[in-house]
From Swiss-Prot:
This is ATP-dependent helicase/nuclease subunit A. The lineage of its organism: Bacteria, Bacillati, Bacillota, Bacilli, Lactobacillales. InterPro entries: AddA (IPR014152), DNA_helicase_UvrD-like_C (IPR014017), DNA_helicase_UvrD/REP (IPR000212), P-loop_NTPase (IPR027417), PDDEXK-like_dom_sf (IPR011604), PDDEXK_AddAB-type (IPR038726), Restrct_endonuc-II-like (IPR011335), UvrD-like_ATP-bd (IPR014016). ATP binds at A47, S48, A49, G50, S51, G52, K53, T54. SUPFAM superfamilies: P-loop containing nucleoside triphosphate hydrolases, Restriction endonuclease-like. Belongs to the helicase family. AddA subfamily. It comes from Streptococcus agalactiae serotype V (strain ATCC BAA-611 / 2603 V/R). It catalyses: Couples ATP hydrolysis with the unwinding of duplex DNA by translocating in the 3'-5' direction; ATP + H2O = ADP + phosphate + H(+). Keywords: ATP-binding, DNA damage, DNA repair, DNA-binding, Exonuclease, Helicase, Hydrolase, Isomerase, Nuclease, Nucleotide-binding. Its EC number is 3.1.-.-, 5.6.2.4. NCBIfam families: addA_Gpos (TIGR02785). One of its GO terms (molecular function) is ATP binding. PANTHER family: ATP-DEPENDENT HELICASE_NUCLEASE SUBUNIT A, UVRD / RECB / PCRA DNA HELICASE FAMILY MEMBER. It comes from the Bacteria. Heterodimer of AddA and AddB/RexB.
Length: 1207
């Protein structure tokens, strides 16, 4: 059939005009139309937040299909598996719509084919695609197609550590042993182990793996900075310019301060103050030295300049005016600290080069040996697979040409988050002029995953400067947010983001613009709010504030506004989302919202199970039972709702003895033998008596019963399970408690017994700052959402609260003794031996850690990259809101304004200040104060602690107190009493006819075993229950060093393999290998199948050989059904299952079954499966009326294959 031709620029212009003049309610923008139809060259679409980039991508793909391009001729890379699934769903919907409107049968047929082809088309992550290439063409590198992915970090660490240890030993005894020891000590200091050095090696290795060719990067770039920056003349010009800029900025800021009336006050004699004159002199010197730098100093005089600056400016960072401190000199101090000692640094820096060459050799050797170990294991990391794929395409022109010819277009979503490995893959798949890239550098927030926004930026600039290389299309219309959100976002980033910090100039071409008239409507009440807790830090006595990312007081501030929105503006809770920077340590928010009755659901893998209040109470209860001398746990138990001791009660108990453990004090109080027994009131005595009796009962019970039974006894004795059911989020709380009992049960089933071991396991999890997975329950529909900013990317919410904007950015990487740069290589802190600089009798040994020049340059590059990423993170967070945006932090109302009053530079905050600021709040307040004469579209509101009382905050659904000791109160409803009576009667009937009630019509062998284990000893296949039960995954953490294989998955794969082997008179190893490739199982599962044993079975065993001889009588994977009678109730039921295989001969049947169970003694398995094989034999007898059945087990789980004949 003939398809429509692709459009030229004139055709596209016509469509743009028609769209503009149409009466569509939602019109496509000219830029969207251009992005959909442009053809014949590379296209980069810079799509701002909410601009419809997914819409554009789907429409472009659909247009390709309608013009005759098959779906399998498109390569479409997405950032996540989820994004790929959503893209496929949208495509299916659009194709179905096109099918309905298609006029020709040929087109309908073609579109139907594309609809079918979506699931097998190359639409997915780059990881998935590179695996596909290596599976198919890995043989060119000697890589087996049956490899598995090393996803378990423990397994990776075991292999890495073994390789490292062997290599470390070789270097310690090699020809450069003395230098190597010096290298190790440079990073490990006086530590006796080499752990710090090992971490540096792993850091370099991981960084190199993010490049498109790790070995080449290590050989050509790793030492580049160390070999280049060896003297003053090598210092980059931009570093000098940056220093001079900081000097001028400092002078300008100081001049602004001297102009303040408060500062210019004269002394009593009418002359300027000493400080005033001193600061005027500093201004004069900084301006003079910066303007005449080349004449006065030049690069060789940088050390002298740094010393001159040090001599004239104060040693501290701040200048105080009218009681307010201004950090005027902070940035300047930071910039000159390394320059002051450059002469000394250059003197010793050369010594470090040989050590770095040694480190280079070590990492290269480590990389190669680690790779060889993985090849031996046939298990690889994702980065290995990606590099194999690149190597395959680079070294095999025919394979590369195959893909380049195949793909009409190479498309990529979220291009700003590409790394260099992915970029190289896209280059190899493209023919040079058929790439389509969609992204937004302002939303590049995955640097921790080695994403490099400069890849996008380089394309952006190249296409902007030279359109022949590719077409740049900018989508800036936002179809998500109201004008209040767009205006505030623009007002912040117009003054904040440029190429220095943020990696792109936020000019008019990037400013967000409302895409529809509806969004342009003004809603003054929805103006963006910066809500700040008014505090001088010392005002808050939040002992918990360091424990959480957001303090309880800030959480109250948020709760108050949410309750106001809900009650006064009728905003549903589900329309509100809280965004945080981290997915951990948000307990303060959870607890505060619980307190005020605000429903809250967390998203994105929040793991706070062990930190939930109800679980913490139970863990402390178990700790106390295990060891009553654990004061912390015991006091927590007494204070908990289970026993309700208050502070006064605990104080009276505590003073019964000064030195004893608290449990002994409780016993003294119980027997009234303490130092102050007169303080034990009758009411308190009754409480203690009840506690002691209950507690001792629990301790006695724990000695002879399982953990599961103990936990449920605690729940029932103190009605604790019922108690949490009366609290907010009752379903979640009860599910957590239920999960604790099941997890304890699973723990004991693993072979570990006892309360002490269980507690140690839990404590180990907590010590490692880990947690157990949260229990999933049916989440409330109308609840506030809590998620990380990263998780929110691509989503939209009506009301957004960005929390904890006063939290400092993490700069931990900048303090590392080793900093890496993709372009300049390594920079280190070098520990120099400077004892020759001083007289030996004064200091016999002097070692100084100095920041080498490459380190200083890399440090500044890393700092700017970190600040740029944080700025983009703030942009992502602010652009999630549809209606209203809140930003929440804390600051001092009396001090903040002057602190952030800066001098604008090119309509931006000064670069020096932007580099100094380390919180979102710093940026927001500085913009607000510096540009206060402009309309900024966001307000700053301070809230005092006095406004955050319970009375001011309010409550959503206040709950009544629950008394666990009052059984009448807990069962107060007559209806409940009657219901319980009826249920008890029903339960009696249920117990009487339990067997018949629980018996389903159809059973499998394993279910028969479950109910009638005393009668039969069998084990079979799948379990079918008649009553559907909610099943929750209560997995305990795996502390083993290697990933365990799922026995069920392995068993299923072996059975499928045995079914797929093409049977003949002579089964060969090639037949088994071929069948294995067809098995539908994970690569790791297939790799675990020991096909050598299967080959041995066919080649060496009598049964295996006989099966091959009688292949025409062979039946495999044969289903059966058989009627049985329940011996207890007389009810009839059907047993159903699948027999692995049997030979149907003239007068007998040979029945065999494969087992992958681990075993030492085969007789154990013979006994275990006696019942199952008997059932299978009975079914075959009834089916064929043949009495003689020979039964065999083929055991694959031992060191050697065993064939066991059953009785």
């Amino acid at each position: 059939m003939t398809f429509k031709p692709f459009l030229n620029p004139e055709d596209i212009a016509v469509i743009q005009t028609e769209e503009k003049n149409s009466d569509k309610k939602q019109k496509r923008t000219p830029e969207q139309i251009e992005a959909i139809y442009t053809f014949g060259n590379n296209v980069l679409v810079s799509a701002s937040a909410g601009s419809g980039k997914t819409f554009v991508m789907v429409e472009r793909i659909l247009d390709k299909l309608l013009r005759g391009v098959p779906i399998d001729s498109l390569f479409i890379s997405t950032f996540t598996v989820k994004a790929a699934g959503e893209l496929k769903e949208r495509l299916e919907k659009k194709i179905n719509e096109s099918l309905k409107s298609a006029e020709s049968d040929d087109l309908k047929q073609f579109l139907t084919q594309q609809l079918v082809g979506i699931q097998t088309a190359d639409i997915g992550t780059m990881d998935a695609f590179t695996q596909k290439i290596v599976n198919q063409y890995g043989y060119t590198l000697g890589i087996s197609p049956i490899f598995r992915i090393l996803q378990d970090k423990n397994e990776q660490d075991v292999i890495k550590n073994e390789v490292y240890a062997d290599l470390f030993s070789d270097y310690m005894t090699g020809k450069n042993a003395a230098s190597f020891i010096k290298l190790v000590k440079n990073f490990s200091g006086n530590r006796k182990d080499s752990k710090a050095f090992r971490e540096m090696v792993y850091k370099v290795y991981a960084f190199s793996q993010s490049t498109d060719n790790p070995k080449r990067w290590m050989q050509t770039v790793f030492l580049k900075g160390a070999q280049t920056y060896t003297d003053f003349e090598a210092i980059p010009d931009q570093e000098v310019s940056s220093l001079l800029n900081v000097m001028q900025t400092t002078a300008n800021q100081l001049r602004d301060l001297t102009d303040q009336e408060d500062y210019k006050q004269l002394t009593a004699k009418g002359v300027p103050t000493a400080n005033y004159k001193k600061h005027l002199k500093i201004i004069e010197n900084l301006v003079h030295w910066s303007q005449d730098f080349n004449l006065l100093y030049g690069k060789k005089g940088l050390t002298n300049l740094a010393r001159d600056i040090t001599n004239v400016i104060p040693s501290g960072n701040d200048v105080t005016v009218a009681g307010v401190k201004y950090p005027i000199f902070k940035q300047l101090h930071n910039r000159i600290v390394g320059l002051k000692h450059l002469e000394v640094i250059f003197k010793y820096q050369g010594e470090s080069l040989f050590l770095l060459e040694l480190l280079q050799s070590f990492v290269l050797d480590f990389s190669e040996q680690y790779l060889q170990e993985k090849i031996q294991e046939n298990a690889f990391e994702f980065s290995d697979i990606a590099h194999f794929a690149i190597q395959i395409l680079e070294e095999n022109h025919d394979i590369r040409q195959l893909y380049q010819d195949k793909y009409h277009e190479v498309m990529v979503d979220e291009y700003q988050d590409n790394n260099h490995t992915q970029e190289r893959m896209l280059e190899l798949l493209s023919n040079g002029h058929n790439r389509f890239m969609v992204g937004d550098i302002k939303q590049s927030i995955y640097r921790f995953r080695q994403a490099d926004p400069q890849i996008f930026n380089d394309k952006y600039k190249a296409y902007q400067d030279n359109p022949s290389q590719g077409k740049l299309i900018i989508l800036k219309e936002n179809f998500r947010s109201q004008s209040e959100v767009l205006d505030s976002t623009n007002s912040v980033f117009t003054h904040l983001m440029d190429e220095e910090v943020g990696d792109i100039l936020y000019d008019e071409s990037h400013q967000l613009k409302a895409g529809s008239p509806r969004q342009q409507e003004r809603h003054p009440n929805n103006k963006t709010q910066v809500l700040l807790l008014d505090t001088d830090e010392d005002d808050i006595d939040d002992s918990d504030s360091q424990q959480y990312d957001i303090s309880p007081a800030e959480a109250k501030l948020v709760a108050k506004e949410i309750i106001r929105l809900h009650k006064e503006e009728n905003v549903p809770f589900q329309d509100i989302t809280l965004l945080v920077s981290s997915r951990t340590r948000n307990d303060g928010i959870l607890q505060t919202f619980d307190r005020y009755g605000i429903p809250l659901v967390t998203d994105g893998g929040e793991q706070n199970y062990l930190k939930s209040v109800e679980v913490m109470v139970m863990l402390d209860t178990l700790r106390s039972i295990d060891n009553p001398l654990n004061d912390y746990a015991l006091v927590a138990l007494l204070r908990s709702p289970m026993f309700g001791f208050n502070e006064d009660d605990l104080t009276r108990i505590a003073i019964q003895d000064v030195k004893m453990a608290f449990y002994h004090k409780v016993k003294l109080s119980y027997h009234k033998e303490g130092h102050h027994s007169d303080l034990i009131t009758p009411e308190l005595s009754s409480k203690i008596d009840h506690f002691m009796k209950t507690f001792q009962t629990w301790r006695d019970f724990a000695k002879w019963h399982s953990l599961y039974d103990l936990i449920w006894k605690i729940y029932n004795d103190r009605f604790y399970y019922d108690y949490v059911g009366a609290l907010p989020k009752a379903e979640q709380r009860q599910a957590n408690l239920y999960a604790l009992a099941l997890r304890a049960n699973q723990f004991e089933k693993t072979g570990f017994k006892g309360l002490s071991r269980f507690i140690r396991m839990i404590d180990k999890v907590l010590e490692n700052e880990n947690d157990l997975a949260d229990v999933e329950v049916a989440l409330p529909q109308n609840a506030v959402n809590l998620m990380t900013i990263h998780k929110s990317k691509g989503l939209e919410f009506k009301y957004v609260f960005i929390l904890n904007i006063d939290k400092k950015f993490s700069m931990v990487d900048i303090t590392s003794p080793l900093i890496l740069s993709r372009n300049q290589g390594i920079g280190i802190k070098y520990v120099a031996d400077m004892r020759h600089e001083l007289e030996e009798e004064i200091l016999p040994a002097v070692k100084v850690s100095m920041e080498t020049l490459p380190y200083q340059l890399n440090k500044r590059e890393l700092r700017l990259a970190t600040l740029s990423e944080q700025m983009r993170l703030l942009y992502v967070a602010m652009t999630r809101a549809e209606k209203k945006l809140y930003l929440v932090g804390k600051a001092s109302q009396t001090k903040w304004a002057d602190h952030y009053d800066l001098v604008s530079e090119n309509n931006h905050l000064p670069l020096a200040s932007r580099e100094t600021f380390v919180t979102f709040q710093d940026w927001l307040l500085a913009v607000h104060e510096t540009y206060k004469k402009q309309e900024l579209f966001y307000d700053i509101n301070f809230v005092s602690l006095e406004e955050l009382t319970d009375h001011h905050i309010g409550m959503v659904n206040p709950s009544l107190p629950f008394n666990p000791d009052n059984k009448v109160e807990n069962r107060q409803s007559e209806d409940i009493v009657r219901a319980i009576s009826v249920l008890e009667s029903v339960e009696q009937i249920n117990q009487t006819y339990k067997a018949a009630i629980e018996l389903p019509t159809v059973r499998t062998p394993s279910q028969v075993k479950k109910i009638y284990e005393p009668i039969l000893d069998i084990e079979g296949v799948d379990v079918m229950e008649t009553i559907t039960k909610t099943s929750v995954d209560f997995k305990l953490p795996d502390f083993s060093t290697s990933k365990k294989q799922d026995p069920a998955a392995l068993g299923s794969a072996v059975h499928e393999l045995m079914q797929r082997i093409e049977m003949s008179s002579h089964v060969k190893m090639e037949d088994i290998q071929k069948a294995l490739t067809e098995v539908n199982a994970e690569t790791s599962v297939k790799a675990a199948i020991q096909i050598e044993k299967i080959n041995y079975f066919f080649q060496e065993t009598s049964l295996g050989k006989y099966i091959q001889e009688e292949v025409e009588h062979l039946h495999r994977e044969a289903p059966f059904a058989m009627l049985k009678e329940d011996p207890e109730s007389g009810e009839k039921f059907v047993v159903r299952g699948i027999i692995d295989g049997y030979l149907l001969l003239e007068n007998r049947i040979i029945l065999f079954d494969y087992k992958t169970d681990k075993f030492v003694n085969p007789l154990e398995l013979k006994e275990r499966y006696q019942g199952q094989m008997a059932l299978y034999a009975e079914a075959l007898k009834k089916s064929y009326e043949i009495e003689k059945i020979d039964k065999y087990l083929i055991l694959l789980g031992g060191k050697q294959l065993e064939v066991v004949k059953m009785d």
